[in-house]
């Protein structure tokens, strides 16, 4: 469940489009009828406070973010199959069948596009969620160590 002020900061469509037009976002994308974006202010505030941002972006968001002044390190967590994606969605029991079908089609597109050269620095195969999580944590710890050893 997404929570205001924790997972996202919700604004109405007009406000986000004004912010996008004003250049206040590093990236933005529309996904399943919702507009998502990463504000420059949020990322800059994190940097000033010596924090590292970990973001959950779709493929278009990653492409946009790669073209910013930042040096993002991108990790794609690849499902082993579309059946795995469908099973996870069904287990959540939050979407209707047509929505699940739409999300599986989007996952197929993402899986195909994730192979684009230079888009992802690392790809983790999610054959076991706990192992994939451990790999992600190790990558984050390595990147944090590298960052603080060079700055």
Curated annotation (Swiss-Prot):
GO terms for molecular function: guanylate kinase activity. SUPFAM superfamilies: P-loop containing nucleoside triphosphate hydrolases (SSF52540). Gene3D superfamilies: P-loop containing nucleotide triphosphate hydrolases. Keywords: Kinase, Transferase. InterPro entries: GK/Ca_channel_bsu, Guanylate_kin-like_dom, P-loop_NTPase. Residues 1-141 form the Guanylate kinase-like domain. Pfam families: Guanylate_kin (PF00625). Belongs to the guanylate kinase family. This is Guanylate kinase homolog.
